[in-house]
């Protein structure tokens, strides 16, 4: 959610900080600010709105200085306003940026008021700022003051602190909110995502839970939750420098839709041999972890949850294991039964989704045999803390509405189905069919992208609609759910998805000429039942848009528009039918003039509960 960038250098850093914020805009925000130390003084500029507003203000009134911090804020405590925007100051000495929620901020605020501190904002973050200032009265360094401060905090935080009286130092702390250190030559950096720092460094170390780090131009010292000095592995980023550029595309979302064939090629590459998915696709020790699995518990949020829902059908139908899929925030707050030989699977593009992380930690305490994450972010918390990791290799995804991450997640889950299935007696023929399907996916997705022009024309029908209904059966039901989510996310049209067999149990009451019904209809064993559902909608005057296999024998008429989808096998069908639904949501949003890449009120990476 909130974006953080910090720098300690000999050169002026304001431009580096603002560029870092631009590269974090995908996280969602409502205001932005920067504070820089120059000649022993803290200078700060904040603006409500886009980073461009902050950039324009700095062009008019530049900030000089080699040590600074910057932030994009997602409002949690206090409305979006300049006085609530970060960085926050204490007595003109301390500046702080923060991502997370301090749950005991009311109690701390009252204590600080008793010590004479005055609050200028409604945020929980200002508590951190004044606490550090207060701790400096009894601690001899900024590091010691921050270490004492975080011991008083309850909740989640990723925070960076600077002091005008100690102008070549940042102190960084994390608990429940990610931070990464970037290493330069005679300069060092910090950010909430390595993407922010790629223009200035490619060497990174990820802080772990409870870490506090002291960062100067030439040194980085990291201390664990107990105050012991520790080393964190420094890795070279695999993300390309231009990952944050749109290139020839109008929006990141469209770019990422069209990157799906390449993303799938990368995720499959090196993971199939002799007509089998290799156990090592999930880690060096995966064979041992996966060989006796009889139950799979999948935990995820949003789009990732839909990927897990599709995988449930595969794992139960083809791999011969029971499977449960649950929203992470729900899993945490109910007493679930642990089955013997259970595998916990988390799915997260960022690897830092707060609810998913917390659910995974709870599951480990419960005694799951093994944990696996399907993730796109090397070095993220889920990757570090799980027994196994399937690295998606989808490349940076900037658009808030997930596209290529979803299809790559589906591919990874199909691979997991093949591996668990092999350990449970799946035939060699089925394994070969799955691997053949995986290897054919990139080309088949390329074919599906050929529907773009037809779908752009179709989108005109949705421009004046306020509601839409998506229908699917079997493993296409989660795809209908994903299609509905995409439409509501970026076009702001209220959309719902139902298993088509549920039509009689409520949704039919909504059907009329103003409620478009979108149906996904691959040529599978459920097709004839789906056709019956279509007739139920037709009989009630509904206008339908059917994405159907070219061999499915649907014909367009006055009440039904049929969009032929390239023929595909049962293994890849959910993935292929996702593509036209992504394109539909994109083109409807384009016509409506909404913010495609940064839809209102949404964030890419949800790092607070």
Swiss-Prot record:
Catalytic activity: D-fructose 6-phosphate + L-glutamine = D-glucosamine 6-phosphate + L-glutamate
UniProt keyword terms in alphabetical order: Aminotransferase, Cytoplasm, Glutamine amidotransferase, Repeat, Transferase
GO molecular function ontology, one term from the record: carbohydrate derivative binding
Stretches assigned to the Glutamine amidotransferase type-2 domain: 2-218
E.C. number: 2.6.1.16
EC main group: transferase
Localization per Swiss-Prot or TrEMBL: Cytoplasm
SUPFAM superfamilies in alphabetical order: N-terminal nucleophile aminohydrolases (Ntn hydrolases), SIS domain
Record's GO cellular component terms: cytosol
Domain SIS: 286-426, 458-599
Record GO biological process: carbohydrate metabolic process; fructose 6-phosphate metabolic process; protein N-linked glycosylation; UDP-N-acetylglucosamine metabolic process
PROSITE patterns, alphabetized: GATASE_TYPE_2, SIS
Pfam families: GATase_6, SIS
Matches recorded under InterPro entries: GATase_2_dom, GFAT, GFAT_N, GlmS/AgaS_SIS, GlmS/FrlB_SIS, Ntn_hydrolases_N, SIS_dom, SIS_dom_sf
Intrachain disulfide bonds: none
Active site: 2, 604
Broad class of the protein's primary localization: cytoplasm
Oligomer status and interactors: Homodimer.
Family matches, as NCBIfam families: glmS (TIGR01135), PRK00331.1 (NF001484)
Protein role: Catalyzes the first step in hexosamine metabolism, converting fructose-6P into glucosamine-6P using glutamine as a nitrogen source.
Protein known as: Glutamine--fructose-6-phosphate aminotransferase [isomerizing]
Organism: Shewanella oneidensis (strain ATCC 700550 / JCM 31522 / CIP 106686 / LMG 19005 / NCIMB 14063 / MR-1)
Phylogenetic placement of the source organism: Bacteria, Pseudomonadati, Pseudomonadota, Gammaproteobacteria, Alteromonadales
Gene: glmS
